[in-house]
Curated annotation (Swiss-Prot):
Ways its activity is controlled: Inhibited by glycyrrhetinic acid, carbenoloxone, 11-alpha-OH-progesterone and 11-beta-OH-progesterone.
CDD domains (UniProt xref): type2_17beta_HSD-like_SDR_c
Family from the record: Belongs to the short-chain dehydrogenases/reductases (SDR) family.
Enzyme class label: oxidoreductase
Function: Catalyzes the conversion of biologically active 11beta-hydroxyglucocorticoids (11beta-hydroxysteroid) such as cortisol, to inactive 11-ketoglucocorticoids (11-oxosteroid) such as cortisone, in the presence of NAD(+). Functions as a dehydrogenase (oxidase), thereby decreasing the concentration of active glucocorticoids, thus protecting the nonselective mineralocorticoid receptor from occupation by glucocorticoids. Plays an important role in maintaining glucocorticoids balance during preimplantation and protects the fetus from excessive maternal corticosterone exposure.
Keywords tagged on the record: Endoplasmic reticulum, Lipid metabolism, Microsome, NAD, Oxidoreductase, Steroid metabolism
Gene Ontology, cellular component aspect: endoplasmic reticulum
Subunit-level organization: Interacts with ligand-free cytoplasmic NR3C2.
Protein name: 11-beta-hydroxysteroid dehydrogenase type 2
Residue numbers binding NAD(+): 82-111
Gene for this chain: HSD11B2
Annotated Gene3D superfamilies: NAD(P)-binding Rossmann-like Domain (3.40.50.720)
Length: 427
């Protein structure tokens, strides 16, 4: 212990020197975060004294202090000046809120909407400055995309285009992959992937010229399997991988690419319960009889109820997502990935660090909708259906035909399990 003071003091000296330099540059956030960081370093110092040799302790303390102070640095922002940004999907939600904020900051905003007479478009026209331009565009129509690209090139000829925000997205059904029509997968890919790809490729000449930014709103459903979001998640997974490629390939041009992965937020689409009910009825009406008999209408009804319950817990304040998009556009060194909202850390921890079985239990529909093994295709869970024994079972009849299982499902529905907390914002 006698040799300890020099590494401990040396580490604190390095931390103090870094903090002093940041203070002189007005580049250090003061207050509770700084106090918490100092408390963390003090606790780490105490542990290192007892567990590590001096040189290792010096390295650990100095590295931790450097990282912590880097996180406490005030983010350096670029001036707005006359920068122009194009945002897709501004009828409502994140796109609408981002367009309003960027316009208020002084950006020249090109906002695309599905309908120029939609409530969101009329709101933007009423509350924003004359710099904001509303453009009608359907990402599934190449003619619309070509028209918007041409308008953007002409409109930004003098100022240049600084940023593209790929925000537009679509999810149609909440159901197992087998239940979703193939057309649903194609539609999600057209809007969420190919639409963003066409917009990005079409505007890259302008973005390379300005060394600008590409910001894409994706979803955690593209990073890991989420129950009943196969079509949407598949398209977002492809989109995230594409943006990862762009991020590497555009580095020589100075173009920075960021992905936004929001938690569950209460956008206009989420709040429209009538829309989800219509889509559920549409799915039930179009399902082949064989699938409807194998899965049962009760299963789809329960999934829809769980989904709506999870959306009722969505975060009402969209500002974390809007702030993340703004930071990705203006930060001198934007992050590659932003995770606005609460609860994401736990989900990613379960998926990436816990045993694979934990992720399957938490993300499987079977964890929220136990089914009688005589009627359903899930693994045999005799303790969920006490009236039946394990073993092979025919795929016949809906769950309502089994009174024991029906009562058990109703009992388990009241517990709600984890799945309502695992559904994420999907727009």
């Amino acid at each position: 212990m006698e040799s300890w003071p020099w590494p401990s003091g040396g580490a604190w000296l390095l931390v103090a020197a870094r903090a002093l330099l940041q203070l002189l540059r007005a580049d250090l956030r003061l207050g509770r975060p700084l106090l918490a960081a100092l408390a963390l370093l003090a606790a780490l110092d105490w542990l290192c004294q007892r567990l590590l040799p001096p040189l290792a302790a010096l390295a650990v303390l100095a590295a931790t202090g450097w990282i912590v102070l880097s996180r406490l640095a005030r983010p350096q922002r670029l001036p707005v000046a006359t920068r122009a940004v194009l945002i897709t999907g501004c009828d409502s939600g994140f796109g609408n809120a981002t367009a309003k904020k960027l316009d208020a900051m002084g950006f020249t905003v090109l906002a695309t909407v599905l309908d120029l007479n939609s409530p969101g478009a009329l709101e933007l026209r009423a509350c924003c400055s004359s710099r904001l331009q509303l453009l009608q565009m359907d990402l599934t129509k190449p003619a619309d995309i070509s028209r918007v690209l041409e308008f953007t090139k002409v409109h930004t000829a003098s100022t240049g285009l600084w940023g593209l925000v790929n925000n537009a997205g679509q999810n149609i059904f909440v159901a197992d992959a087998e239940l979703c029509p193939v057309a649903t997968f194609r539609t999600c890919m057209e809007v969420n992937f190919f639409g963003a790809l066409e917009m990005t490729k079409g505007l890259l000449p302008l973005l390379r010229r300005s060394s600008g930014r590409i910001v894409t709103v994706s979803s955690p459903a593209g990073d890991m399997p989420f129950p009943c979001l196969a079509a949407y998640g598949t398209s977002k997974a492809a989109l995230a991988l594409l943006m990862g490629n762009f991020s590497c390939e555009l580095l020589p041009w100075g173009v920075k690419v960021s992905i936004i992965l929001p938690a569950c937020f209460k956008t206009e689409s989420v709040k429209d319960v009538h829309q989800w009910e219509e889509r559920k009825q549409q799915l039930l009406a179009t399902l082949p009889q064989e699938l409807l008999q194998a899965y049962g209408e009760d299963y789809i009804e329960h999934l829809n109820g769980q989904f709506l319950h999870s959306l009722s817990q969505a975060l009402p304040d969209l500002s974390p997502v809007v702030d993340a998009i703004t930071d990705a556009l203006l930060a001198a060194q934007p992050r590659r990935r932003y995770y606005p909202g609460h609860g994401l850390g736990l989900i990613y921890f379960i998926h990436y660090y816990l045993p694979e079985g934990c992720g399957r239990v938490s993300c499987s529909p079977s964890s929220s909708v136990p089914m009688c093994q005589e009627h359903y295709r899930l693994p045999a869970w005799p303790y969920l259906c006490p009236g039946h024994s394990p073993g092979p079972r025919p795929q016949t009849g809906p769950l309502s035909h089994c009174p024991v299982s029906r009562a058990h499902v109703e009992q388990l529905q009241q517990r709600r399990f984890l799945v309502p907390l695992l559904f994420f914002q999907v727009f």
